[in-house]
Amino acid sequence: MARFPEAEARLLNVKICMKCNARNAIRATSCRKCGSDELRAKSKERKA
């Protein structure tokens, strides 16, 4: 997707909160915005 591996790592190495859709650090255990612990890793491939 991204042109450079550094940019791809910066864009895709995050966790997404399933309650409020906030972007969180990859090592986060709870959401920085709403406090929920329902986090998922961001998808590495886009769905068509």
Swiss-Prot record:
GO terms for cellular component: ribonucleoprotein complex; ribosome. The keyword Ribosomal protein applies. Keywords: Ribonucleoprotein, Ribosomal protein. Pfam families: Ribosomal_L40e. GO terms for biological process: translation. InterPro entries: Ribosomal_eL40_arc, Ribosomal_eL40_dom, Ribosomal_eL40_sf, Ribosomal_zn-bd. One of its GO terms (molecular function) is structural constituent of ribosome. PANTHER family: 50S RIBOSOMAL PROTEIN L40E, LARGE RIBOSOMAL SUBUNIT PROTEIN EL40. Belongs to the eukaryotic ribosomal protein eL40 family. This is Large ribosomal subunit protein eL40. The lineage of its organism: Archaea, Methanobacteriati, Methanobacteriota, Stenosarchaea group, Methanomicrobia. The gene is rpl40e.
